[in-house]
Amino acid sequence: MADITAALVKELRERTGAGMMDCKKALTEANGDIELAIENMRKSGAIKAAKKAGNVAADGVIKTRIEGNFGVILEVNCQTDFVAKDAGFQAFADKVLDAAFAGKITDVDVLKAQFEEERVALVAKIGENINIRRVASLEGDVLGSYLHGARIGVLISATAADEELVKQLAMHVAASKPEFVKPEDVSAEVVAKEYQVQLDIAMQSGKPKEIAEKMVEGRMKKFTGEVSLTGQPFVIDPSKTVGQLLKEKNADVTSFIRFEVGEGIEKAETDFAAEVAAMSKQS
């Protein structure tokens, strides 16, 4: 067995752009022969995957699965909506979802490690960066889910609710994007931050501090209602809030999870003219 030195790993990294562990593994399998390691990495798609790793993957799909009192929601990213509809990409996402559900896996790093070889092979085949971004689960008395075009997904847990009500509530969460279940669930940190913003706005109007503070109290009540599920007007019947609807039905919502494809990912704006100019210089 050849000695796999740090210098050898460094050289392979520089030549392929692959990660340190991938390079070490390739060198070990090639018994220290760097040329053979490169050839094997090319065959496996590892080099192509490494080159694609820096590409922003902000498109993709949301997948959900519920059985009984357990549900899972997953986001898998790619770079374009075209690939998001690809049968191979969809099959990969379904396979990851099945594994997450079967193993009740909520640590995305565990899923990434489990599916890294398949991900690398798919990147080589499709030609886009692919990323298992996040996974979460819910348990509860009554679970519901809703998918809006595979780009927005919701899992929701309720008590004393029928299937139709839970579906409607999941649709509401998808459309109205609440951040909390109830106004009292809004964290102290979020409340303090918004209070200061509203106080600054009120003070800028020239009002005395005492009056400004009273104005802000009213605004804060409105704010906590707007960001909480039960405080929002129900999308199907805006004449009542979700809280009023739940009271009528003697039901309650315990928790929900909402995923939207690419949310929070900064997608670089492409200057097409500059890109063409750069490509012409390379050719």
UniProtKB/Swiss-Prot annotation:
InterPro entries named in the record: EF-Ts_dimer_sf, Transl_elong_EFTs/EF1B, Transl_elong_EFTs/EF1B_dimer, Transl_elong_Ts_CS, UBA-like_sf
Family affiliation: Belongs to the EF-Ts family.
PROSITE patterns reported for this sequence: EF_TS_1, EF_TS_2
Protein name: Elongation factor Ts
Location in or out of the cell: Cytoplasm
GO CC terms: cytoplasm
Described function: Associates with the EF-Tu.GDP complex and induces the exchange of GDP to GTP. It remains bound to the aminoacyl-tRNA.EF-Tu.GTP complex up to the GTP hydrolysis stage on the ribosome.
An example molecular function term from Gene Ontology annotations: translation elongation factor activity
Keyword Nucleus: no
Organism of provenance: Erwinia tasmaniensis (strain DSM 17950 / CFBP 7177 / CIP 109463 / NCPPB 4357 / Et1/99)
NCBIfam families given in the database record: tsf
Classification via Pfam families: EF_TS
Region ranges (Involved in Mg(2+) ion dislocation from EF-Tu): 80-83
Keywords attached to this entry: Cytoplasm, Elongation factor, Protein biosynthesis
Main location: cytoplasm
Keyword tRNA processing: no
